[in-house]
Amino acid sequence: MRHLISMRDIGREEILNILDESERMEAILNEKGHCDFLNGRILATLFYEPSTRTRLSFETAMKRLGGNVIGFTDISNTSVTKGESLADTIKVISGYSDLIAIRHPSEGAARLSSENSKVPVINAGDGSNQHPTQTLLDLYTIKREVGHIENLKIAFIGDLKYGRTVHSLCQALSLFKGVEIKLISPDELKMPREVIEDISGKIKLSEMTDVEIDDVDVVYMTRIQKERFVDVNEYYKVKGIYRLSKEHIGDKNVVIMHPLPRVDEIDSEVDTLPQARYFKQSFYGVPVRMAILKLLFEDSVK
């Protein structure tokens, strides 16, 4: 694995290898909190869009591996404001670092970066396109909290049009046998047809607008992404259309996930329920990203 840009680029066996390595990283964290696999190495985090969990978990992961971090979170302090191209930025920064994690508002920016980099590039989110490291931590959460990925029944609820985490996860789940997916969203925020076409025939799909979660293993809530709407009035038409409450959950044997940040789509009272695993899901970002960084670096020096 030279880069991690899209879930389309990696197969089932590579996914399982990353999940196994993530388990080893979690064991190291629980046992001693750190290791020196990437001692003396540098990760560059290039965040052209705001981020809390992804950026901080990448930085934490690199430091837990014994490495160091450089990067930026505010492009107003970079040469981007002078008109420097993304390709030139990557060519320069790949000379300073051993790995690059990039988040960018433009679809395809991570792929372009990989084509201009001397070191492995990790897509930390490119517009509404892909977010592969989130997908891998989602799969790890499912494996740890549900116990299986094959024969999984999962409901995705909310913004399925702009939700890059949902696009990536659906594509990954299509590699596993017996998966059933419910896509629950308003008509304005349905899953893009290209994603549907990519996974149809590989898994059982159903689309609906009403919340039906009685027979699923996982409920995956998503935020309605205001920043993706060209017309803010369209956002307010769908804002708050789905809100998961204690009454929805009851005593169902279900795992509730959310890529975070949450706005109003999950009542805060749900946080105390045993079914709520979204904060644990966020924690899993550290061992999973440790595994990704370690494996990518090892492959780059073979």
Curated annotation (Swiss-Prot):
The keyword Transferase applies. It catalyses: carbamoyl phosphate + L-aspartate = N-carbamoyl-L-aspartate + phosphate + H(+). Its EC number is 2.1.3.2. L-aspartate binds at residues 82, 164, 223. Keywords: Pyrimidine biosynthesis, Transferase. One of its GO terms (biological process) is amino acid metabolic process. SUPFAM superfamilies: Aspartate/ornithine carbamoyltransferase (SSF53671). This is Aspartate carbamoyltransferase catalytic subunit. It comes from Methanococcus maripaludis (strain C6 / ATCC BAA-1332).
